[in-house]
Amino acid sequence: MSGIQFSPSSVPLRRVEEVQFGILSPEEIRSMSVAKIEFPETMDESGQRPRVGGLLDPRLGTIDRQFKCQTCGETMADCPGHFGHIELAKPVFHIGFLSKIKKILECVCWNCGKLKIDSSNPKFNDTQRYRDPKNRLNAVWNVCKTKMVCDTGLSAGSDNFDLSNPSANMGHGGCGAAQPTIRKDGLRLWGSWKRGKDESDLPEKRLLSPLEVHTIFTHISSEDLAHLGLNEQYARPDWMIITVLPVPPPSVRPSISVDGTSRGEDDLTHKLSDIIKANANVRRCEQEGAPAHIVSEYEQLLQFHVATYMDNEIAGQPQALQKSGRPLKSIRARLKGKEGRLRGNLMGKRVDFSARTVITGDPNLSLDELGVPRSIAKTLTYPETVTPYNIYQLQELVRNGPDEHPGAKYIIRDTGERIDLRYHKRAGDIPLRYGWRVERHIRDGDVVIFNRQPSLHKMSMMGHRIRVMPYSTFRLNLSVTSPYNADFDGDEMNMHVPQSEETRAEIQEITMVPKQIVSPQSNKPVMGIVQDTLAGVRKFSLRDNFLTRNAVMNIMLWVPDWDGILPPPVILKPKVLWTGKQILSLIIPKGINLIRDDDKQSLSNPTDSGMLIENGEIIYGVVDKKTVGASQGGLVHTIWKEKGPEICKGFFNGIQRVVNYWLLHNGFSIGIGDTIADADTMKEVTRTVKEARRQVAECIQDAQHNRLKPEPGMTLRESFEAKVSRILNQARDNAGRSAEHSLKDSNNVKQMVAAGSKGSFINISQMSACVGQQIVEGKRIPFGFKYRTLPHFPKDDDSPESRGFIENSYLRGLTPQEFFFHAMAGREGLIDTAVKTAETGYIQRRLVKAMEDVMVRYDGTVRNAMGDIIQFAYGEDGLDATLVEYQVFDSLRLSTKQFEKKYRIDLMEDRSLSLYMENSIENDSSVQDLLDEEYTQLVADRELLCKFIFPKGDARWPLPVNVQRIIQNALQIFHLEAKKPTDLLPSDIINGLNELIAKLTIFRGSDRITRDVQNNATLLFQILLRSKFAVKRVIMEYRLNKVAFEWIMGEVEARFQQAVVSPGEMVGTLAAQSIGEPATQMTLNTFHYAGVSSKNVTLGVPRLKEILNVAKNIKTPSLTIYLMPWIAANMDLAKNVQTQIEHTTLSTVTSATEIHYDPDPQDTVIEEDKDFVEAFFAIPDEEVEENLYKQSPWLLRLELDRAKMLDKKLSMSDVAGKIAESFERDLFTIWSEDNADKLIIRCRIIRDDDRKAEDDDNMIEEDVFLKTIEGHMLESISLRGVPNITRVYMMEHKIVRQIEDGTFERADEWVLETDGINLTEAMTVEGVDATRTYSNSFVEILQILGIEATRSALLKELRNVIEFDGSYVNYRHLALLCDVMTSRGHLMAITRHGINRAETGALMRCSFEETVEILMDAAASGEKDDCKGISENIMLGQLAPMGTGAFDIYLDQDMLMNYSLGTAVPTLAGSGMGTSQLPEGAGTPYERSPMVDSGFVGSPDAAAFSPLVQGGSEGREGFGDYGLLGAASPYKGVQSPGYTSPFSSAMSPGYGLTSPSYSPSSPGYSTSPAYMPSSPSYSPTSPSYSPTSPSYSPTSPSYSPTSPSYSATSPSYSPTSPSYSPTSPSYSPTSPSYSPTSPSYSPTSPSYSPTSPSYSPTSPSYSPTSPSYSPTSPSYSPTSPSYSPTSPSYSPTSPSYSPTSPSYSPTSPSYSPTSPSYSPTSPSYSPTSPSYSPTSPSYSPTSPSYSPTSPS
């Protein structure tokens, strides 16, 4: 597996903390060089040995096995290669720095090297404010480039002018030289100087040689370098000019020998040889004194070779070619691009320990298993270190060798030496030593990462457990294919084997499939039941599906963890039958409740629609995709949230196995018969299609006879098309519906559609009824040639069949024309998909690169690698998206009256409350005050919701902790009866709730910002809690008692804390994936608005690209203009505003323009106009009369369109007035009145006084001039409206608003939508509601309303695009993207122009795009990269500071010292003590005394590496796999006294692995009698213990550390307590009383049973052989046959005993579990002595005086 074996390096490895960029100085190049290269040849004369001083000089390192390196003396494998150098005869420009060289030249005086400006210039001081050196250089350059002279201080001729010390001179102190303007031409720089005062002279122009530039740069002073943003230490400007060229070692430009004689050299070697030759030519010419132009030519050649050696893709330069004509691969080409060094070899590499093959489905594997072919299992290995615990196993594997499956391939000794077992003669005899490593084959149960490309989201790589199987494909469970987006038509997938325990731990704890069931993308499951299991489970759960006894018995075999009890049959006579629902109920875990009403009906549901599951029993409903699919709030989601990932996995496995077994015997197949509808239906279909054709024909007739009215905002053609499409789609749907109704329910296609496993209504209608209209580019099939679609049809045929309507079904078959049209539509789909894949792939990459380093920090904020705050709280609530789900705010939908009825309590008037309560609270004014206060708060909450948070009345929002479910669970667990009054007081409820709210912390801290953020984050959840736990609801609706209420409070707090996002979570990448993944599902095309088809809106991928690129000019810019309420309600008023806004130019209303020669201004040659011209001049006007002679004889005549004038509500005087306004006195205008036959405007030019009318020469110009005026008038004279807004459409929008009584109602309002944008002016139009008006170009919003408005506009636009096709992405991902784009105060595009202009590290930027340019820039400004980002650490091969790498581990050295003493090498390896299976309830591994060394029991992964070990943590198929690890096992030292998780199935709906541990001192648990998570006085031998009793919990109130069966997980036991110590005198592993071999304790003794829930090896009264014993039987009692835990007559000590009775006491008469003075935290509580208290200062597990056995 491993490539070349390098000998281990002796160099100590350290972490790269930062990377400094810079330019190599000539001195450095010479000093690190080992050889001066002078000859272009590689080999000496013999052709066998490398030539000294040649390009393969032996000092540079060897690439030949025969030679050793002359510098370091190593062989080819170990010599890293050494640099040489070439001394250039003349300096040359470095091509990467050429533009920078030009900039610097323009900043300094080219004569004395001084900066052209200094601090006397105010602009200069501004430039020095830039922190970033690159920006500073640009700023200085902008100021300097215009200065054309170097200012002097004192004139150079004066006596005290000091040449040696320029800074001593006053003023600027320059040299006064004129500065050239510099032009770059190819690889050369030209300077041109202005010649003195005489402007007529041409400027002097000459070439600036690199040598001159080099000289200037050496003169620049240190201060000036700093001002210029250059770095004196790492990147002086004179080093940008190459004087010495480094020669890379041969190992980076290896040559290949062809047939032993000739060698093929690398491109770089060829290039270097060209440089050496050119260099020699320049040197020769110089020595010979050749003419200047020849030397210059050779210098240019040298410059060209050096430039193309580095970059062979210079614009405007010929490429350097190989002899074959292939361009050479330059250094730049090696680095850039996808295949280049950075992206191809550093950011992503090919890896070892991976396998790839085809995948196949296997429903019998567990959800997280992966079937691996045996050949792969024998090839891939895992290095396991030899320890006392596995030495025998590993020895066995070594014995098996590399060819037998569970074997081993290599042994690695502690010296690092590898033994290959394939070639070792007696491999089996090698004795293993501790500390050696064995590379063993992978075997069942190993975890691996499985992946399918393209990896679009984190569920594309998940952890699986392997199972080695025969044959050559990977096998995986069907349900896991959906997140991978895999199918079994030949897909291949990759498997990666982790190579360290740390990696395996991360895979197990973070990436395992069950943990990925619910995705953060849309907070819903990504896996559900699919395919045949889904079709089967629907059939299986139908009401009329019965099973016989035999069938049920066989099925029971497949039910996981079946307890051996059959559910009672539903039918007893004539024969015993069970239903499928009963069997499914066995698989659903107990404690799961689900309700879904499809149609609001009574509970006795005749149609069996909807779904009701109570306590894991299906009451009614058919199980289909809605229930067991990957749906929000479905069964999978509920089980995962309530019971944890492992149980959820068990549910998947169980349902698949049971249903597939049943389906195997029941059968389900589909044939062509299932698509055939009956004859009547076919007649109906034919009739429907005929009718549609008739309607279309009618439509065509209407259009041809001009009877069709165009719809608003559409042309006639568009209206016609829209109408035809409507008719045809209607026809297809109707035909399909009739076909669907005719198919029976037993029809197999219909069954699949009903189950949701495959197919939809449209598939049925296309197969059986009619395929329907084919669409290309959103329209019907267009006319391709000569006005028709195909030669089969007449010209201009618009009939359905000609334009692509297919009236046949797939069953009947398509005609050739139909087939052709169908192929057209299909082809479009394929092309679309192909184009879309490339586009979205690039979008995804850009998103990830823009957000890869955004992470949740340990202070709860979201920051990027530079530590800039992006969000104060992740998603503004600081929660993990996987752990939130949609919840409804009850108070929002109620009317004010209903609200009052539900929440208000008035003790004086309403007496009903007291009926529900034990204690009377009537007439208690303090209680009433509390209640009033609560009600005021609830009203305020409701106000806030209605006004600000959900003004549209949508009452659903994703929130943590499903409160409703917790209440339901409580009602079940505590068996609360509706009739019993409660012992809760209103004050208890209100105080309990307030305490809970105070504990919901996401941020700890008391400063103002923290408090604000904390309050904002939890506000919605607080409102939800207050509305759910209002006093009236708790007492009257849920009827909770005190215990239940306190349990609920504790549960809510615990679950809320789990829902808080983990620090180190890489939320940026998650957000990028959550947006990129739906983008791949998006359709590329833009769609039309329904109804108004000319209102085109860009959607889908093109719109997403516009948003991410922050495009200035978007395809369809549009404003949504909302109107004032009174206008929005009235169509006519809205129409007025529309005309106000729509931009109307003169050309819009003009129907014709003419130019006439009409010399007499007072009369006219045009007959039509005579009347109004005469009428105009009939009334004399002195001013007009005076100026008559100035009027031009040429006349411009405009004719206006009356219909348009009326539509736009314009009058003639309006139009003429605008013209006059525009031209003022230069144009003379007269016009006809508004009701004349024709609307005419006549214009003449008024000439200046000096141009008299007789001047004929100007006549010619005048008509031409008039023509230009005409064009100008039509376009630029704006009659009314807002510029840029070309069209305005009126739309009716549905809005939701709150009305008087507090409910929400739907209403319509008129809204204007525009083509074109101009937000500023549109907002000022009268009647426009400026607060709601919106532009879809957020670039415009940024300019007008600022960055915060832009952020919400951006969010809205993103939402529109993603939710258009029904995807849902959780708010926090979109919000994070918007915040990243706007957090810098300007819009950062998700392109190289945005991402690469941020201040992130150079390495990170160069891994995105513009690789070489960024590295050059970094070098030139001497940047430093602090390696905080993700990309940098990936390149350097280091653990990046993210996730599990975001923190360090703090190790308690002393504890370690004490601990290691007890480790004894186990002797009983594998003596029959396998991992015992305990029932979920038993938290204690009862079968061993705490002092025995645990030996080989239980796999380490069972005791998960944290104090949270608890029932069912790591089991297979939902059993608890208890790692029974004894005293000295390394996994047990972590149990601190306050840390026992109370979760286990006896009590709480238990949370599985992710549960935080409650501390016993949590007030929410203190007074519950049945819930003493860690009270230290319970003994399992006490007669009151019963596994099924409601008050029993493995962690229950009476557990005693001194009892013989006391276990290591007990809170008071801690290995660090001094009295327990392997060296303490009272403990001895060999003492006779504690020995595995002692007679009283033996694993094989008849009294030992690891599965018994209450087994204690020393209890005399318990025996598994006792006749009445059955652990699951409710009436089981170890001592008495009549014992029943719930019967009041049972009593261990007294006749009146009842477990909840206040006088019941295990130890003393005055002890009462519910009495307020009893609490594990109360100081007076003590199990053994009055002075004991867990929180008292004297109690501490590590305190020397504390001992579990000492009395105090």
From Swiss-Prot:
Residues found modified as Phosphotyrosine: Y1531
Keyword list, A-Z: DNA-binding, DNA-directed RNA polymerase, Isopeptide bond, Magnesium, Metal-binding, Nucleotidyltransferase, Nucleus, Phosphoprotein, Repeat, Transcription, Transferase, Ubl conjugation, Zinc
Region of interest (Bridging helix), residue spans: 816-828
GO BP term (any one): transcription elongation by RNA polymerase II
Stretches the record annotates as C-terminal domain (CTD): 1558-1752
Molecular functions (GO terms): chromatin-protein adaptor activity; DNA binding; DNA-directed RNA polymerase activity; metal ion binding
Domain notes: The C-terminal domain (CTD) serves as a platform for assembly of factors that regulate transcription initiation, elongation, termination and mRNA processing.
Name of this protein: DNA-directed RNA polymerase II subunit rpb1
Species annotation: Schizosaccharomyces pombe (strain 972 / ATCC 24843) (Fission yeast)
